[in-house]
UniProtKB/Swiss-Prot annotation:
Family named by the database record: Belongs to the universal ribosomal protein uL22 family.
Alphabetized PROSITE patterns for the sequence: RIBOSOMAL_L22
Organism: Vibrio cholerae serotype O1 (strain ATCC 39315 / El Tor Inaba N16961)
GO CC field: cytosolic large ribosomal subunit
GO molecular function: rRNA binding; structural constituent of ribosome
GO biological process assignments: translation
Function text: This protein binds specifically to 23S rRNA; its binding is stimulated by other ribosomal proteins, e.g. L4, L17, and L20. It is important during the early stages of 50S assembly. It makes multiple contacts with different domains of the 23S rRNA in the assembled 50S subunit and ribosome. The globular domain of the protein is located near the polypeptide exit tunnel on the outside of the subunit, while an extended beta-hairpin is found that lines the wall of the exit tunnel in the center of the 70S ribosome.
Stated name of the protein: Large ribosomal subunit protein uL22
Subunit text: Part of the 50S ribosomal subunit.
Family annotation (InterPro entries): Ribosomal_uL22 (IPR001063), Ribosomal_uL22_bac/chlpt-type (IPR005727), Ribosomal_uL22_bac/org-type (IPR047867), Ribosomal_uL22_CS (IPR018260), Ribosomal_uL22_sf (IPR036394)
Gene: rplV
UniProt KW keywords: Ribonucleoprotein, Ribosomal protein, RNA-binding, rRNA-binding
Amino acid sequence: MEAIAKHNFARISPQKARLVADQIRGKSVDQALELLTFSNKKAAELVKKVLESAIANAEHNEGADIDDLRVAKIFVDEGPVMKRIMPRAKGRADRILKRSSHITVVVADR
């Protein structure tokens, strides 16, 4: 039994979000939620919301017991990039890349 939750177009760099995702992969949902709650990273808050959604999906749609769930898969894919221009000295300009992510969490029974 698996339950999936996604957050598409999350406004965070995939590189930064993967740091948090790698920490909770394979852990029980209780451990993962605890770890995310006390993390200072912006990505931790976003991943926590997706994880809570996946847990709710498992409970509501599959009738799963929360105590038996673990983070089976979690991955962060690259979303679209917004390109912006930053004016610089002497008429030049730099490109600013505002990256986004697609966060996917899959929870399953042990």
